[in-house]
Amino acid sequence: MRQRTGPYSVGATATTRAGAEVVFKHLVVAEAWSEWGTFPSRARRERPGDDAPNGVGAIRAIPPAREQVVEYDPPRRYAYVALSGLPLKEYRAEVTLEPRGFETVIRWEGAFEPKYRGTGALLRLFLDRMLTSFARRVAYHCERCEPGCPARLPDIL
């Protein structure tokens, strides 16, 4: 992880047969998160990015959390920070996509500082499982993405 935030870090890796471009679209399009994730409510983009609709500055809401894109380098790197809705003072996640032959390695890393003293170990366990689930689910979905998925819309980057 290039830029570390907080004393705790977590990470997960998954491999998919989908290309890095396909995976990147599923990461940056907020509405696509509802296609591959298991969230209590629909994900949506609240605000477009400064130079690209889903780029740096874009704000995504996956209630109760709100996140802002801080790094956008298609199709290799994507990073975001939590703005609200999580029991964390600071949270930054970075996703790196590495093409390897006919596959793409998804490396999802996060760093955080707990909001409440004594909760760091429990939050690390939770976030480690969450990122592992995210990496596996997006990898699986990208190999089987159906028409109608928001990540398949033209000109989304």
Which positions does each model-derived feature cover?
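Hydrophobic ligand-binding cavity/cleft-lining segments
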Residues: 1-50, 155-157
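A structural signal for short, well-ordered beta-strand segments
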Residues: 10-16, 95, 108-110
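Hydrophobic-ligand binding "helix-grip"
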Residues: 34-35, 61-105, 111-113, 132, ...
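Juxtamembrane/interface motifs at transmembrane-helix termini
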Residues: 42-46, 55, 126-128
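Acidic pyrophosphate-coordinating catalytic loop
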Residues: 49-53, 88
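Short coil-to-beta transition motif at edge beta-strands of beta-rich domains
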Residues: 53-60
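A conserved amphipathic terminal alpha-helix motif
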Residues: 111-157
